[in-house]
Amino acid sequence: MNTKKTLLATVAALTFAGYSVAGMANDGGLAFGRSQAPAPLEGTWVVTIQPIVCSSGIDVPGVPSVRAYLTFAPGGTMTETNSNMAFEPGQRGPGHGYWERTGRTSYQFALEAFIQFDSKLAPFRYKRGYQRLDQTVEMHTTDDWTSSGRVQFFAGTSTTDPSPSGCARSTGARMF
């Protein structure tokens, strides 16, 4: 009889422990980092990017906002394309990067895009090289978010000498 009680208690304890470990691993779908768990950020977003003055956060005078599409894929990869009229046709390629969850409704992402050739038309803004965006994202609902962060331009293959760089504030709306 004692053996049956001990065996029953052991099975009950192992069953409870198994469910507890599974519950902790799932964490209600709130996995962090570049995990495989689904995240509300996944999907394609219509994004409005506004260049801002880094020190004050005010819009850069005379610089219009840019419309972009950002796609956040499962596993932490992303792609981007935009309509920035400051680039000449074919001058900037699509952006590729990564994203990760940093909090319950917070994320960060980084992407880079090649600048294929120096600007040929005045005001000769961009040199051949690449553009990098580093942004922090705060989701407000499952269908909208805001972000802010750095936008850097690097000439050639340099990683230490950014050409005209700045900051940007963005709003994202899920594409339906």
Where are these regions (language model features)?
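Bacterial N-terminal signal peptides
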Residues: 10-19
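Tryptophan-anchored aromatic micro-motifs
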Residues: 37-59, 95-97
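Edge beta-strand at a domain terminus
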Residues: 29-30, 151-176
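Hydrophobic/aromatic beta-strand elements that line small-molecule binding cavities or substrate pockets
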Residues: 67-72, 95-100, 128-143, 149-151, ...
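Boundary at the C-terminal end of the N-terminal hydrophobic targeting segment
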Residues: 20-25, 31-33
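N-terminal glycine/threonine-rich, aromatic-flanked beta-hairpin/loop signature
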Residues: 59-106, 113-117, 144, 155
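Amphipathic hydrophobic-ligand
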Residues: 62, 91, 124-132, 165-171
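Bacterial N-terminal signal peptides that target proteins for export
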Residues: 1-9
